[in-house]
Every structure is written in C-alpha cells, then in structure tokens.
Amino acid sequence: MKAEKKTFEEALARLEQVVRELELTQLPLDQALELFAEGITLSKYCNSCLEQAEQKISMLMADGELKDIPGALSGGSSREL
C-alpha cells in the first residue's frame, strides 16, 4: 500500500474496493496477490482503529470520563494509516 495517510473511513472504503476488485475481476496472479496483501494491511489497520475505539468506550462507560492511556486513539477518526 502507498505511504499516504488514511482515516478509518478512507481505509474501510479502500478495503471494500479491494474486495470487490478481487471478487469481480480476473486478475493476473501477481496483481491479485498485491491487492490481497493491501487488503490484509487495511483490514489490520481498521481492526486496530475499532479496538481502540472500543477501549475508549469501555473507559467512558466504566468511569464516566475519558482518561489518557498510552497508545489510545486521541481524536475520533483522526487516526491515520
């Protein structure tokens, strides 16, 4: 995947595009493997964003206020890839 930075929403949209492309087109093996690798990277990134959001929600539900934790998502969907 390119070195450009993506928000969660951008990464998810690209992941959906990659999946459609792999499902609906006949690609050469090398190109299909490249897309598959990009999809795996995007999937891991999106999963990480969701896990961090879940941590924030759990903290808010437990304490009623948000506390800083190392590595936590700091601002909504501003996390970038």
Swiss-Prot record:
Enzyme's top EC category: hydrolase
Top-level taxonomic group: Bacteria
Quaternary structure and partners: Heterooligomer composed of large and small subunits.
Reactions mediated catalytically: Exonucleolytic cleavage in either 5'- to 3'- or 3'- to 5'-direction to yield nucleoside 5'-phosphates
InterPro entries in alphabetical order: Exonuc_VII_S, Exonuc_VII_ssu_sf
A GO CC term assigned to this protein in UniProt: cytosol
Entry keyword set: Cytoplasm, Exonuclease, Hydrolase, Nuclease
A biological process from GO: DNA catabolic process
Record protein name field: Exodeoxyribonuclease 7 small subunit
Segment forming the signal sequence: none
Keyword Hydrolase: yes
Entry's family note: Belongs to the XseB family.
PANTHER family (alphabetical): EXODEOXYRIBONUCLEASE 7 SMALL SUBUNIT
The UniProt record lists the keyword Nuclease: yes
Annotated GO MF terms: exodeoxyribonuclease VII activity
Major localization listed first in the record, in broad terms: cytoplasm
Cellular localization per UniProt: Cytoplasm
Function comment: Bidirectionally degrades single-stranded DNA into large acid-insoluble oligonucleotides, which are then degraded further into small acid-soluble oligonucleotides.
The enzyme's E.C. designation: 3.1.11.6
